[in-house]
Design a protein with these regions (language model features):
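Short helix- or helix-capping micro-motifs
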Residues: 1-4
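Acidic/histidine-rich, surface-exposed loop or edge segments in extracytoplasmic proteins
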Residues: 6-10
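Mid-domain, small-residue-enriched loop/turn segments at the edges of structured enzyme/sensor domains
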Residues: 13-64, 71
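Domain-terminus/edge residues, biased toward the C-terminal soluble/receptor-binding domains
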Residues: 36-37, 51-53, 57-282
Length: 282
């Protein structure tokens, strides 16, 4: 990983799967499990082949997954390493020119073939924003470095991480406070119903957003004010729509926090008796 050892990649593939072809099949199975729709592998080393391809987006997804492996993460964040080869020490230097040079960079990998030209995937973290930058097809190392630095600095200068889950839930809490008598529960023994989000449907807790769009995030709550009893806890009663500029919008179900039973004959009898004895007392 540090010095693009294609021979090591082949040795590992043959040891694990018996052949490059078998190992490539494992790679493609993993790609499918990660949801990579524009990637196909024919080798572990990535040398040019018509059927060996990927995209910048898929490379970012692969990198995000790979960085969850502590050993991989440590290797790609290592600038140099001494190895002992038959008693002779040899220093391996990481080919990632941004490692140790640009603030926050902690990996990941350079690449070059005649068909792909100069490529670089970079992982960089500053404060609470952690990004993966991918540049492909650069003519020179200088272009690769310059483009990566420009992209990384642009993101950190123009984007912030916001707690979208907390924003949604705060909005729903405010709605509950301001709409105490919103619901009419037909034949319900109570009219007091509170709502909350179905948390499992919120796709992410945080999202990076352009600073100019933070105030433009729109959250709308849509619920039916008329509901027939009984109402069970966790019953879907509406939706909250979230529109994020320059990002995919999504919706989350709103569910009831409490249950409300339906009025039955015993309820009416009880009310009748209460009214009757109240009149007698009066």
């Amino acid at each position: 990983m540090m010095v693009s050892g294609n021979d090591a990649a082949v040795a590992l593939a043959e040891y694990i799967s018996g052949s490059i072809e078998n190992f490539s099949n494992l790679m493609n199975d993993k790609a499918l499990s990660l949801g990579l729709s524009s990637t196909n592998f024919t080798s572990p080393h990535g040398l040019d082949h018509d059927e060996h391809y990927t995209t910048a987006y898929d490379l970012a997804l692969i990198t995000d997954y790979a960085l969850s492996n502590k050993t991989f993460s440590k290797i790609v964040n290592t600038q140099s390493y001494m190895v002992n080869i038959n008693g002779n020490l040899k220093q391996l230097n990481n080919t990632n020119e941004l490692l140790g040079y640009l603030e926050g960079v902690y990996g990941v990998k350079t690449g070059f073939t005649n068909g792909a030209n100069r490529c670089l995937v970079t992982a960089c973290k500053r404060k609470d924003l952690d990004i993966i930058c991918v540049v492909l097809g650069c003519d020179t190392k200088k272009d690769r470095t310059k483009d990566s630095i420009n992209l990384i600095n642009y993101i950190f200068n123009n984007y912030s991480l916001i707690g979208i889950k907390n924003i949604i839930e705060t909005k729903v809490d405010e709605w509950n406070l301001n709409n105490n008598n919103y619901f009419t529960i037909n034949k319900g023994i109570s009219q007091n119903l509170e709502i909350k989000t179905n948390e499992s449907q919120i796709p992410y807790e945080y999202i990076a957003i352009n600073n100019s769009n933070i105030e433009k995030v729109a959250i709308s709550i849509n619920v039916n004010p008329y509901i027939d009893a009984p109402v069970s806890s966790g019953c879907t009663v509406g939706k909250v729509e979230i529109a994020i500029p320059q990002s995919s919008s999504f919706s989350v179900d709103l569910v009831s926090c409490n249950s409300i039973s339906r009025k039955n004959i015993y309820y009416y009898m009880n009310m009748f008796l209460k009214d009757y004895f109240s009149l007698l007392t009066f």
